[in-house]
C-alpha cells in the first residue's frame, strides 16, 4: 500500500509540473451519491485540490450498471479534465454481462491508478438474529430462498459475490438489486432487507 501511495504522490508531483489542471476537473462517479465509490471520490477531491491546485468536482452520472457515467467519460475530450472514478463493474463486469456498452473498456480509457482496494463483506443490521457467517449459512439451509440480499445493482460485484456465496454454500437467497450502494445502506439499516 505504501508503494501505491508513493507512486500516486510521485505522479501528482510530475503532473503539477505540467501546469495541469488549467480548468476545473470533473471526477465522474457512475453511481448514485452515498455509495462507496462516491465516498472515495469525495475523499480524494480535496486532497487532489491541495496537492495539484485547481478545482475538482464530483459528478454522479448513475445508471445502467455504471455504463452511463463511463460512457460519458469515454466521449469526453481526452484532455485530462474528465476522470472516471469507478469500481470494476462498468469496465470489467458490464462488458461481459450486457449486450452492448457505449465504450471499449480497453481502448477508450487511460488507466491512471488504483486508489483503493476493498473487499466485499457480508453485513446484516445490528438487530439481526444472525451474528456470524455460520448463522447466515444455517438460516439459508433451513429456510432456502427466504433471506433477502441487497446489492448495488444487477451485475455489480456485490451481486456476483452473493451469487458465488450461494453457489459455494449450496444455498439460495433473494437478490434485491438497488440503484447504488447508498440506498442499500439506508434500507439495510432500516431493516427493509436482511443482508448486503
What are these regions (language model features)?
Residues 14-16:
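N-terminal signal peptide c-region/cleavage motif recognized by signal peptidases
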Residues 75-81, 96-183:
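Hinge/capping helix and adjacent helix->loop/strand transition within the periplasmic-binding protein
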Residues 80-86, 148, 194-196:
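Paired acidic/hydrophobic, glycine-rich loop segments that form the ligand-binding mouth/hinge
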Residues 25, 34, 41, 58, ...:
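Residue-level signal for nonpolar/aromatic packing positions in well-ordered secondary structure
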Residues 67-70, 184-185:
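Short, hydrophobic alpha-helical packing/hinge segments within bilobed ligand-binding/sensory domains
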Residues 37-53, 159-167:
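Short, polar/charged alpha-helical segment
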Residues 27-41, 64-65, 150-157:
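Extracytoplasmic "Venus flytrap"
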Residues 2-7:
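Sec-dependent signal peptide recognition
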